[in-house]
């Protein structure tokens, strides 16, 4: 929650609530409570540093006692201090009020409240805003799309040349530097009524803006200001398209413009808070369609008129950020409004990133891509110890530090993310502006052509953001664009472009065949039947580097189906702003079997190609004749023995479902050099044997069409695919957490000079800040337990594993393990032994069930029914339970006695009495997995933290190898791992419990 500005007067009185903006959610009391709570948190943090704080906060009649424990005891035991402080503040304020009343009586000002003067930077800000408003309005009167400075000297010498309409009563037009604070505030409040009109037409003036708001402003007394009439006419929006769209940053026209005198007087008291509120508030987009309602009543909400005063706020913030002088430094240092600061930092980042790309307009920064590929963009001049993130994640202190270094911050692009940013396609939110547009033609045809040119990446004089394709596009006038669809283009004749216009008439609803002009290959003419000559032709010039990408826009009332002149095997896409035609007049042009609906189909096709590529390469590595499904879990579990060579730089081996379009295409480009390496064939020997003998467990074969992998899951219901997918995601996340845990332990052991990995004492490091320095982590990722990270951050950590380094600056208790404690030094060995014991138990349990393959043990069911399964041959004093709870010595003893261990199923565990005897019959059922509940380790206390974080990972790490290599029947999964909510089937035969 951000405070709207700095108070100019530190006194407390009954009029102070007016200085707080009423639009802040929750009101002033909630803000004060929140700030006092934050102050109390700071005192608590200071107490941890052996610092005592005592603080008294006074607001009107309420007093808050904040501080450390000793500080609060001190203040509570001395109530006279609070009373003295309260009398001091109230007495001083009353004295100031009396002096103010006397001064007002002397000056003869009885009913007008005094406006406190703020710092010099604040009056500069108001004058700058007024100057920006005058320049924008003057440029609009000239018909210019760019900003033209107002010739104040010429206007003063020739009063009749320029007429200013809508200025507040008693204020004449002059230079903004000559206005006082009160006049500036009134001008800003009535900025939506102000209009410039050229009395003497110049060569530059083309047309005069017409707006209904000209007719509803109070009359003025100045000679250069013409009073406006009180009548209001309803005008359609199309008659003045530039009045609302040519303003910088698309400021909406207000629909409530009448003001009451009382509201005008009270709003003059807002000072810097009003300035900050004007910079922060944005008019809602819903007001855009209400332009015709000029005579609406003023909203009773206080401060609602201030929401209309954002005409040039973003333009002004851009000037503040890029001003080389120190004129705005004091304003940036003094303001406490986090929204203004974040907006400034956002403008700074976007402009610097655009400058690095060589563009002359701001471009949104791809924060997520930069976070995933920090080596692609180098950021110079950034403040120390501040990571580069989205501005919305910074607080006020960091935002101010960034703005202090704004002139030194520069971006350097080392590798590009997406070339489409230069193509002017739908993925750029800010497009280039041009000053060469003309406003003299018909508004309707001009708007339609401008929309078409904007979609093709052409800059136009009108607001390019109105025509840029985005997710927020809504149907509107012809100058706006509707929803966008991607259509696959196919044409038998490359010289013919086929265009279908459904719904225009019975004669033109079919397909129009147009011959492409061969004289200029860069010009394509599209003729829409049934329209006028002014709107039927669109001749866009293709500036995109990709000649296969064509963007076409037509009026909103027409639906278009466009076919491009490309070969069928090279699919490309065109933007279709029309609706899907259910009548199917253009369905003849489409091949329904090859139709691609959008990006989702593209990425699915790419993932299928990469999946087939991996299966072929894996089959080649193991000597199989056909494609074999890759056991991804095995490769993630044993990265030193199973790995892949030849992948593109920065791309780790994972399932194709984890990649995006960019990485999938890069993998396909490097397909010839990709090679699977298997150092330990015994890890995949079971799957290899199945492939060699061609058993039902065979994972795939070569299809003639596109080598699609067919396995047992293709004959199963769809729930099994979802089942395996969910298990694979859980297994991937748990495996990544375990790998990061091992990485941290290894790096921590190296920092201590110990041969083996050492368990990282996360809590002790947190309680002793500065004792251990961790370097090399990706930007924006703090150091904490791996079990608290998601898969994306875990992958980013593993990608920079070589750069991560631990440095111990000062020792503390528990930093170095005891020399006689071998378990702490053999933590990595414990993880391996635990997995071996799990595999041993699963194998023994599978034999006890009469199966020829391992089965996952339902430890929870066995614990609840200890008489159901008997385990023989266990070492002395070692009970049978989940291996996660064993310490290192017990794991070693179990492995030594593995030949003597046997399991005997005395009675079947519910609900599997009859099902287990006939596993092949049960193949159907809508079941889904649930993650196992974590249980606290009962083993060694030193490695308890590791066991807790990896209990679920180790328990589920066996699932994917079993399901992928053998496809264990669902009857072998324990009951608590299944969800029977969607099960709707009949079991074969009666069940005897």
UniProtKB/Swiss-Prot annotation:
Classification via InterPro entries: GTF2I (IPR004212), GTF2I-like_rpt_sf (IPR036647), TF_II-I (IPR016659)
Motif Nuclear localization signal location, chain numbering: 929-936
Keywords: Activator, Developmental protein, DNA-binding, Nucleus, Repeat, Repressor, Transcription, Transcription regulation
Residue windows of the GTF2I-like repeats: 117-211, 332-426, 597-691, 727-821, 824-918
Cross-referenced Pfam families: GTF2I
Subcellular location, principal: nucleus
PANTHER family registered for this protein in UniProt: GENERAL TRANSCRIPTION FACTOR II-I REPEAT DOMAIN-CONTAINING PROTEIN 1
Protein name according to UniProt: General transcription factor II-I repeat domain-containing protein 1
Taxonomic lineage from the root: Eukaryota, Metazoa, Chordata, Craniata, Vertebrata
